[in-house]
């Protein structure tokens, strides 16, 4: 399976503050990879570099083998950033509006994608009429509509309650299978990382560096909860968290 995203020897400093040191990671096509780490170790800085929000200082970033990576990712934050004065369908088609697609085509595509995601009944509602979990679903659909090579999810589920979060995790994994999504996510929630991911990178220290890569391999014929607990204990031990 080809590598959609690859980062080699990436370091970043802000003045005398060294934030990231010699980062080497990759994400394969249709893979979900998580980066976990304590606050302040540079997770969001890394995402901002991949997204082109921050200018790369050293190292390599390639998407599908090309170093022309700017504009090749779809970036979703913890806050859904929906426009409260726009209907759900008009929020969803925002990427098409930016791309200056014909208005009729925009709306047709919007209704089509909402139907695909089983959310067509919300098309003419406004964000304030939706629950937190439903708003986040809409935000994910809008992110998908950018049609980029890879999703960057920055604590995208962290503001949700535990039950809604679990529902959204399952929903996202179904989307990943159906639409062949490739995802790199930041999360402070280790259980979330284990549930969603094929692999996990642990970012630690100052400046932040990758100290461990863990491949998540769950055997469906054995106790799944016990296996996940084993991975959680391993990660907490590596991070020196009791």
Describe each model-derived feature in a short phrase:
Residues 97, 104-122:
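Conserved ABC ATPase "signature" region
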Residues 59-71, 109:
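Conserved ABC transporter NBD signature motif
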Residues 126-130, 134:
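Conserved ABC ATPase signature
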Residues 89-97, 107, 215:
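Short helical segment in ABC ATPase nucleotide-binding domains corresponding to the A-loop/adjacent helical element
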Residues 145-149:
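A short, proline-enriched helix->beta-strand linker immediately N-terminal to the Walker B motif
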Residues 36-38:
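The feature captures the beta-strand-to-loop junction immediately N-terminal to the Walker
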Residues 51:
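Helix-to-loop junction immediately C-terminal to a conserved catalytic motif
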